[in-house]
């Protein structure tokens, strides 16, 4: 079956293409009684929206979301929530040159080989434009988690190219176009993007996403471990090539005596595991990092082939992000929120009455 849905109890299904009439999604499983408006969803959509700064694509889409169903008089009804965003700034002529060519590093070749037909306009379904609906659905999950359980999910850009942050100030993230928590690194990020634009090239990035106040006990071993589902969700984001939970690949250099998160009546002594043990949340912060590749939509000529298999060169035209990691910050938040929301509802349904003699730390 086509992989257009994620989640079990809180299930999100998206549809639409980059240059199609509209994007949409269906959200199933949201409990009734959640106060929600289009404005609540728009806040996160505006953070992801293209054309909002000189550092991202200049495609200007208002990304105004419409709630089609599942909400009555400002409250969720418990039925399917239908959401839609109309596409308004398509420039399909920019892609006429790739109608019969495959952009190297993109999904053009694989989509063509799999389906036998390809919407070449902006990448069609493979475009990151699809993630607008993930952000809209994730905003519902974020609001429910915060209102009902005090769970907060936030993310930031921690590295772009060879420029890494040195500190994290959560209050600084919304003060700059990079979602950067280190004010001292904003200028370096700015200069890096300027240089890339002159070169017609792009760069990769790293994002950290954190969930706080997550209850202990979320996760369904063995195949639906919480960290497994988080990795699945984050890896489904366009351009993501790596996911780390907690210390991630740094554990290779750690000893067991250093890595283990010791316990005491006052709590855990560390959080190397990223808030998940045995696939189940510990009650600590859930911490994940994702690595995003540099986009291949650049003006530097590259070798490729035509649909007939003939060698050719290609320069990608159109409006593209020099670093896709910038606008991926709210997308990462949305995907983590969807997973945590799904597992919270699953846990509540099966384990609501479970009590132990051990106090929660």
Curated annotation (Swiss-Prot):
Q: Known EC number(s)? A: 4.2.3.5
* Binding residues annotated for NADP(+), in chain numbering: 48, 54
Q: Which family does it belong to?
A: Belongs to the chorismate synthase family.
Which one of the record's GO molecular function terms can you name? Answer: chorismate synthase activity
Summary of the function given for this chain in its UniProt record? This reaction introduces a second double bond into the aromatic ring system.
- What keywords is this UniProt entry annotated with? Amino-acid biosynthesis, Aromatic amino acid biosynthesis, FAD, Flavoprotein, FMN, Lyase, NADP
Q: Which NCBIfam families match?
A: aroC, PRK05382.1
Stored HAMAP family:
Chorismate_synth (MF_00300)
In Swiss-Prot or TrEMBL terms, this protein is called Chorismate synthase
Which Gene3D superfamilies does UniProt cross-reference here?
Answer: Chorismate synthase AroC
């Amino acid at each position: 079956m086509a992989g257009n849905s994620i989640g079990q109890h809180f299930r999100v299904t998206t549809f639409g293409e980059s240059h199609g009439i509209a994007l949409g999604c269906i959200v199933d499983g949201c409990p009734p009684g959640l106060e929600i408006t289009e404005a609540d969803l728009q806040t996160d959509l505006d953070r992801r929206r293209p054309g909002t700064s000189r550092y991202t694509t200049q495609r200007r889409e208002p990304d105004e979301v419409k709630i089609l169903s599942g909400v009555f008089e400002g409250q969720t009804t418990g039925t399917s929530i239908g959401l839609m965003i109309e596409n308004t700034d398509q420039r399909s002529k920019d892609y006429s040159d790739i109608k019969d060519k495959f952009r190297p590093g993109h999904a053009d070749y694989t989509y063509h080989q799999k389906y036998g037909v390809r919407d070449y306009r902006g990448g069609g379904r493979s475009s990151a434009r699809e993630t607008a609906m993930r952000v809209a659905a994730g905003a519902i999950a974020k609001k429910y988690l915060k209102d009902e359980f005090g769970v907060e999910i936030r993310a930031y850009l921690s590295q772009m190219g060879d420029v890494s942050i040195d500190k994290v100030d959560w209050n600084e993230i919304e003060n700059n176009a990079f979602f950067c928590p280190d004010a001292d690194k904003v200028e370096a990020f700015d200069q890096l993007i300027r240089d890339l634009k002159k070169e017609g090239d792009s760069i990769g990035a790293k994002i950290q996403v954190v969930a706080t106040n997550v209850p202990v006990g979320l996760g369904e071993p063995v195949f639906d471990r919480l960290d497994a589902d988080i990795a699945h969700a984050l890896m489904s984001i366009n351009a993501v090539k790596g996911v780390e939970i907690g210390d991630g690949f740094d554990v290779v250099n750690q000893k067991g005596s250093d890595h283990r998160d010791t316990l005491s009546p006052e709590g855990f002594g560390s959080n190397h595991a990223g808030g998940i043990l045995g696939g189940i949340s510990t009650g600590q912060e859930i911490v994940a990092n994702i690595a995003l590749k540099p986009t291949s939509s650049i003006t530097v000529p590259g070798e490729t082939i035509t649909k007939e298999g003939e060698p050719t060169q290609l320069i990608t035209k159109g409006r593209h992000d020099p670093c896709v990691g910038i606008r991926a910050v709210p997308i990462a938040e949305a995907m983590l929120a969807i997973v945590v929301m799904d597992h919270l509802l699953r846990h509540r349904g099966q384990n609501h009455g479970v009590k132990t003699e051990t106090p929660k730390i």
